[in-house]
Every structure is written in structure tokens, then in C-alpha cells.
UniProtKB/Swiss-Prot annotation:
It comes from the Bacteria. HAMAP family: Ribosomal_bS6 (MF_00360). Residues 114-124 have a biased composition (Low complexity). One of its GO terms (cellular component) is cytosolic small ribosomal subunit. Residues 96-124 are annotated as: Disordered. Binds together with bS18 to 16S ribosomal RNA. This is Small ribosomal subunit protein bS6. The keyword GTP-binding does not apply. Keywords: Ribonucleoprotein, Ribosomal protein, RNA-binding, rRNA-binding. GO terms for molecular function: small ribosomal subunit rRNA binding; structural constituent of ribosome.
Length: 124
């Protein structure tokens, strides 16, 4: 089995359905004997360019290990899901289990927001 990194972008109006979508894709992978090494929900982010007149979308990254049949099934699911605006599947040399650079940035932003919120709470 080969290792893959999958990033898919979901329509912002469908953000509340993202956890269910992730579970569905995880079930597809594990039911065919694959493994999931990392799942990161990057949240709603600014798009680099407009897609279907949208400026923001919900990003999800998955690192998996599966066979070609499972990968074809996942790609088919992405293509025919109207909520998925774009998807990208990249073959990796080895499993990636640590946080991605994008997730590190998300964590840094959350830490800044938490630090900014603390002084206002202390003043109140």
C-alpha cells in the first residue's frame, strides 16, 4: 500500500457537515484495509482565488495509506460530492504523522487569540 496526502476544500455553507464527511471518508479507507495517519481540519480560510464566486472555504487535510482501489473510490466520492469544491491527492514517500506547516500556523493563530483574550479578562 502507498502513502497519500489528500487536501480537499469544502463549500463554506457546508462547513457543519465536514465532520460527517471526514468520518465517511475514514470509514471508506479503513473498511478496505487502509490506515489513517493524520487528519487535520484547517477550518474556514481565505482562498487564493475565487472558486464559484466564493472567497472562503473549509480546508481538510488527510494523510492515509491505502491501495489504488480505495484511492479511486475516494476520488470518485470527491468528484461527485457537490460540497467539495476542489481536491488534491499527492503520493508520499512515507507516512506523515506530525502536524503540517499549515496546522502549526493555525495553532499559532489560536494561541495569539487566546493570549489577546486573557488581558481583557484580567481587566474585567
Amino acid at each position: 500500500m502507498r502513502h497519500y496526502e489528500i487536501v480537499f476544500i469544502v463549500h463554506p455553507d457546508q462547513s457543519e457537515q465536514v465532520p460527517a464527511m471526514i468520518e465517511r471518508y475514514k470509514t471508506t479507507i479503513t473498511s478496505h484495509g487502509g490506515q489513517i495517519h493524520r487528519v487535520e481540519d484547517w477550518g474556514r480560510r481565505q482562498l487564493a482565488y475565487m472558486i464559484e464566486k466564493l472567497a472562503k472555504a473549509h480546508y481538510v487535510c488527510m494523510n492515509i495509506e491505502c491501495d489504488q482501489t480505495t484511492l479511486d473510490e475516494l476520488e470518485h466520492a470527491f468528484k461527485f460530492n457537490d460540497a467539495v469544491l476542489r481536491h488534491l491527492i499527492v503520493k508520499m514517500k512515507k507516512a506523515e504523522t506530525g502536524p503540517s506547516p499549515m496546522m502549526k500556523e493555525v495553532q499559532r493563530e489560536e494561541a495569539k487569540k487566546a493570549a489577546a483574550a486573557q488581558p481583557t479578562e484580567a481587566q474585567a
